[in-house]
Swiss-Prot record:
Chief location: cytoplasm
Subunit organization: Monomer. Component of the circadian core oscillator, which includes the CRY proteins, CLOCK, or NPAS2, ARTNL/BMAL1 or ARTNL2/BMAL2, CSNK1D and/or CSNK1E, TIMELESS and the PER proteins. Interacts with PER1. Interacts with ANKRD6. Interacts with DBNDD2. Interacts with LRP5 and LRP6. Interacts with SOCS3. Interacts with SNAI1 (via zinc fingers). Interacts with DDX3X; this interaction greatly enhances CSNK1E affinity for ATP and DVL2 phosphorylation, but inhibits DDX3X ATPase/helicase activity. In the presence of RNA, the interaction is decreased.
Omega-N-methylarginine modifications at: 382
EC numbers for this chain: 2.7.11.1
Organism: Homo sapiens
Lineage top rank: taxon: Eukaryota
UniProt-annotated location(s): Cytoplasm; Nucleus
Residues holding ATP: 15-23, 38
Induction: Down-regulated during granulocytic differentiation.
Protein name in the entry: Casein kinase I isoform epsilon
Gene3D superfamilies: Transferase(Phosphotransferase) domain 1
Key words of the record: ATP-binding, Biological rhythms, Cytoplasm, Kinase, Methylation, Nucleotide-binding, Nucleus, Phosphoprotein, Serine/threonine-protein kinase, Transferase
Positions where Phosphothreonine occurs in the chain: 362
């Protein structure tokens, strides 16, 4: 018997799950377009899907934001039908033998800064910036980076007056310890600067393959998080970034120098990496390391030029749509839902705060076919689950998962 949603979509196989419900592959009955269908039992104790849909409505209009196809109730379930997305950057990192080339890191950095800037422009901070929460698009949007999972997001300023939330201390650590900012470890209320500092650690994770505070042993989780904090604070930025272009240490030093309520200079940070990209002589061909491993060679110039034009057209359309959505209502409440913690790579459950490679690493390491197939359990691109983090795919339950995503400009070398 064929299961239908909204009398328009066919329900297919299950492709993921979280504590909030299950995610299925679906298809538009008329057009055959593949979609992601999220189901949540109407009797669930802590309904999340309605809150998630509010985030999407608030973020709609930005380039690359997954479009919401349909929302409503179907039988015993709350349902949200949305655009299907591809694998996460953590999945792709594993596919590439846990090392990205400098070119790929810089291409990603540019887009990731823009995603965070967009969230901040909508008056929210993400508070869980990590590779699992960035996904690639599919098809002609396969080179567009999306940001997902607003389960820990918090409103940091009033939408109308832009009054910033007050500075506070003795806060519980919220987020993922591996990428948490030093101020977060110290129990200081998070703000825009912390999302960007976390991104700096993500970029060095992509460069190095792992961070110095990974793999630390401790008797309890609390002690482990304290050891991570101590190691992070005792590792100078210059040591962390040794062997890599100075732009990475400049980025992190800039983020750590920001005051609590400062508005970061996103353009300056993007330009740091764009200038480095130019000096390295890299090409704006949108060929990431996983493309090389998948196809064995770069695409022809006609394909590259076509993709560049598509990106620029998406950008222009997104700017027009975005300007029409600024009056949308604010997102979900930021109480218990936003404060619940998630489990992933060194996840932090509400705890009290208290290999160098030359910079010329410009192409991915070859790996054997067997290794690659083993690592590709994440289903590279086609048919990959939509808006599902790596932890969903490995069966780990998440607390208060509210995936959402937004994007702004892909690596637009003609602007800014």
């Amino acid at each position: 018997m064929e299961l239908r949603v909204g009398n328009k979509y066919r329900l297919g196989r299950k492709i993921g799950s979280g504590s909030f419900g299950d995610i299925y592959l679906g298809a538009n009955i008329a057009s055959g377009e593949e979609v992601a269908i999220k189901l949540e039992c109407v009797k669930t104790k802590h309904p999340q899907l309605h809150i998630e849909s509010k985030f999407y409505k608030m973020m709609q209009g930005g380039v690359g934001i997954p479009s919401i196809k349909w929302c409503g109730a179907e039988g015993d379930y709350n349902v949200m039908v949305m655009e299907l997305l591809g694998p996460s950057l953590e999945d792709l990192f594993n596919f590439c033998s846990r090392k990205f080339s400098l070119k790929t890191v810089l291409l990603l950095a540019d887009q990731m800064i823009s995603r965070i800037e967009y969230i901040h422009s909508k008056n929210f901070i993400h508070r869980d910036v990590k590779p699992d929460n960035f996904l690639m698009g599919l098809g002609k949007k396969g080179n567009l980076v999306y940001i997902i999972d607003f389960g820990l997001a918090k409103k940091y300023r009033d939408a109308r007056t832009h009054q910033h939330i007050p500075y506070r201390e003795n806060k519980n650590l919220t987020g993922t310890a591996r990428y948490a900012s030093i101020n977060t470890h110290l129990g200081i209320e998070q703000s825009r600067r912390d999302d960007l500092e976390s991104l700096g650690y993500v970029l060095m994770y992509f460069n190095l393959g792992s961070l110095p505070w990974q793999g630390l042993k401790a008797a309890t989780k609390r002690q482990k998080y304290e050891r991570i904090s101590e190691k992070k604070m005792s590792t100078p930025i210059e040591v962390l970034c040794k062997g890599y272009p100075s732009e990475f240490s400049t980025y992190l030093n800039f983020c750590r120098s920001l005051r609590f309520d400062d508005k970061p200079d996103y353009s300056y940070l993007r330009q740091l990496f764009r200038n480095l990209f130019h000096r390295q002589g890299f090409s704006y061909d949108y060929v990431f390391d996983w493309n090389m491993l998948k196809f064995g060679a770069a695409r022809n110039p006609e394909d590259v030029d076509r993709e560049r034009r598509e990106h620029e057209r998406e950008e222009r359309m997104g700017q027009l749509r975005g300007s029409a959505t600024r009056a949308l209502p604010p997102g979900p409440p930021t109480g218990a839902t936003a404060n619940r913690l998630r489990s992933a790579a060194e996840p932090v459950a509400s705890t009290p705060a208290s290999r160098i490679q030359p910079a010329g690493n410009t192409s991915p390491r070859a790996i054997s076919r067997v290794d690659r197939e083993r690592k590709v359990s994440m289903r590279l691109h086609r048919g990959a689950p939509a808006n599902v983090s790596s932890s969903d795919l490995t069966g780990r339950q998440e607390v208060s998962r509210i995936p959402a995503s937004q994007t702004s400009v892909p690596f637009d070398h003609l602007g800014k």
